[in-house]
Amino acid sequence: MNRITALPLSLPLALLLALSACKEEGAASAIPPPIELTEEAAGHYCQMIILEHEGPKAQVHVAGYPDPFWFPQVRDGLAFLKSPEQLGEILVVYVNDMGAARSWADPGEGNWIRARDAFFVVGSDAKGGMGAPEIVPFATREGAEAFALEHGGKVMTLDEIPVDAVLSPIDLTSSTTDTTDTLKTEITE
């Protein structure tokens, strides 16, 4: 093959490679970053001001919506993942890292971690901002284990969380959970 015929063949190949690299870069940038919690953030279900509630929070980013859906409890955010109300493709879910929180009353405005990467304590004595049993997120397994030692519960990843822990009616007198069925979520992360 001479140089003259090789050039026209190599040019389309180079363009295809460049376009595929752009497409991959665009897909990676489609995941929105966490939004810092502000005084205007209202709960998706309750429309109450999120900052007025203690405990960890969740923000769920859904394709086609410019702002995240806010939840005053992580449990509520995880329930949204499996609810029939789910409005579309979930791009990413962020939760407060309680290992970086100032206190239970003040979990922080900017210490967000991806739910997919978090370790959760399920079935502890912790109550969330709405008074229901809370599913408590941590960036590290060690942080979650330390919390579980003090408050009870079991350390789990997102996919290990029991369906009953997020979708069953809330018993405000008990924090036990049935771990027979696990929550499988579809998040585009």
Each predicted region: which residue ranges?
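Bacterial N-terminal signal peptides
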Residues: 8-20
